[in-house]
Amino acid sequence: MRDHVVAVDIGTGSARAGVFTSRGALLGKGEHPIIMNRPRENHAEHDSENIWAAVCTAVRAAVTASGVDVAVIGAIGFDATCSLVVRDTEGKPLTVSTGGEDRFDTIVWLDHRALAEADFCTATKHQVLEHSGHFMSPEMEMPKLMWLKKHLPQSWAKAGYFFDLADFMTWKATGSLARSRCTLTAKWNYLAHRQPGWQTDFLNVIGLGDLRERGNLPEETTPVGESVGTLTAQAAEALGLDRECHVGAGMIDAYAGALGTLGGHAGDLDALEHQLALIAGTSSCIVSFSRERKRSTGMWGPYYEAVFPDAWLVEAGQSATGALLDYIVGMHAAGGEPTAALHDRIVKRIAELRAVEGDAFAERIHVLPDFHGNRSPLADPHAVGVVSGLTLDASFDGLCRLYWRTSIGVALGIRHILEKMHDYGYVPDTLHVAGGHVKNAVLMELYSDITGCKVVVPKMNEAVLLGTAIAASVSCGLYDSLGAAGAAMYPGGHERLPDKRKKTIYDRDYRRFLAMYRHRAELESME
């Protein structure tokens, strides 16, 4: 019986794979790094063939580690960052790089080369922007495509296929040109609640009237949990699987994480409205679901059926969180390469210093964490970070103080987002956290104490892989819905309640946080 699935998660720096049972048990994992090219500031590029090779290596390793026979694997699912893959009319790599190398055919999600194009889209005030928080982020695909057409016209002229990275993976696996409703709705300004979903007038206004024809983009989308086909002979051989293995519609990595963290509530939309998924690693993403469409200024969405049927999804986030802490560690005189061991050492020392100094520890340092722009709730990709309260202290303890207060700034940013969501009618009271941040005791404490929310950490910290596995299990018929699959496969979680004794302290920090935003705006407006 084919009662196992393979889940693949393609992140910024590696491809990971896991083999799951139909009850959500992870039997084996594999991981392989992927390369990134950084030819200029704000430019980041992948080689999609390198990614495919990394995926194949990771899948083979996971299957070997699991000890299962490939004949029991019913489906493989892919999630990925919202990176843009460009292929020519023959399906071969086509350069997106100013360096001209064809192998670099993928603009990475975090690439901000298209700031001007994003601003142009925002200035149109087109109705599609009502579903992206009334602004366009350079991390969306339309600005990236506009940049490509303007700055690399030779690549645009040769283009035959445009893919979100997750859709590229399902194409490589099956040969199907189907696109996921998850990817197109969230990153391509496709309106799944309308017919037609593509808004031709918007494409014409931004100079992409030929996009669908040029990129082989279909009119209809494939919902999460549906199969787009079975593996081709070539893909089956490369992955070490067989041709009867189904391939589920692709997912954006953060939304796969939301499905994995909120899976236990997936069958009850009313309960789901009180839950938030916080997928926190290099950056942080908050995902919320609701039965009714609600205001979303400063956030991405609302997107119809991006994950669950008949549900609206809204996404908020911070463009650099784990990356910001890495930066603080790397730039400080007492820091260095931001390894996991160094982060652990800093976190341990912070606990020691707090035990001695109490609530006064580093209290005069204040940080606005917008070092890579403010995704939410200000929707300002041009925003910059601010640090107040520095001295000449270059010691390791000085680094720990700055790290602590930067972590507070990150958590205050989450509170800022949640308060805006409450203003818009969202009713979350529980944060389900997944990703690298769950390994950081400082952040996990602050997320609860600063937001006032109950924090839940899944018992298995592989929420993104699990979410992809849940969707894959539906695509091969193990379950008839995402709700049924989530109820069966979600492992439960550990809860942490906020320390009410800290409320006064962090309320004051939040007032200072908002004051710093006002002061930054005042400084930047001076002539």
Tell me the role of every PLM-derived stretch.
Residues 131, 149-152, 171, 175-176, ...:
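A short helix-loop
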Residues 357-459:
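Activation-segment/catalytic-loop signature of the eukaryotic protein kinase fold
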